[in-house]
Regions:
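Short, solvent-exposed loop/turn segments at the edges of secondary structure
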Residues: 1-3, 30-33, 40, 54-58, ...
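Acidic helix-start/capping segments at beta-turn-to-alpha-helix junctions
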Residues: 144-156
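Predominant activation on well-ordered alpha-helical scaffold segments within soluble catalytic domains
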Residues: 6-10, 39, 68-75, 125, ...
């Protein structure tokens, strides 16, 4: 997980940090620390040198306090790396890569579960209002396809890929 990277930004020790993200290990610590965590499109940032969890899904993630900070980091790091098979030759980012009014995905009401915690529900509703007031565009999404993808990650073919990626490390450094 990249929790240390998230904490360092949240505490103001640094203005941005890098981590890794396969299935949320960059974005989840960011959310727990009230900062932004961004998992870029595969191949924008080279993965050379990271210890793989699931090579086809791993990405270097970026943590920051503002979208503009994250974009600046991405613009610097976006380079083709001939030693990374997923690296992209064509640059796709520009200073205008993020929309002025970004869309924020929210779960449909029938998919929300606060486990009976009315305080958490009120905090969620207030957060949605703050997002809308801050210029972001809240939009609802169906969680079902994401749950199906997660099932594949933890019970499907990617389990074998993770085993292949991590076996040499475990064998060499028990």
């Amino acid at each position: 997980s990249s929790s240390g990277s998230a904490v360092a930004v949240a505490k103001g020790l640094i203005s941005f940090s890098l981590g890794t993200d396969t299935a949320g290990s960059g974005r989840v610590p960011a959310s727990f620390n009230n900062i932004l965590g961004y998992k870029p499109t595969r191949g924008i940032i080279s993965n050379r040198g990271i210890i793989p969890a699931c090579r086809s899904l791993d990405c270097v993630s970026v943590f920051g306090l503002q979208v503009s900070d994250i974009l600046e980091v991405l613009l610097v790091l976006e380079e083709w790396d001939p030693q990374d098979p997923f690296s992209r030759k064509k640059k796709i980012l520009t200073s205008k890569s993020f929309p002025e009014r970004p869309k924020v995905a929210l779960l449909e009401d029938d998919q929300l579960d606060f486990f009976g915690d009315s305080i958490a529900r009120k905090a969620y509703d207030k957060s949605v209002s703050v997002l809308a007031e801050s210029g972001l565009y809240p939009d609802t999404v169906d969680l079902s396809p994401f749950l199906e993808a997660a099932e594949l990650l933890y019970s499907g073919p990617w389990v074998a890929e993770r085993h292949l990626a991590t076996s040499p490390l475990i064998t060499d450094s028990p």
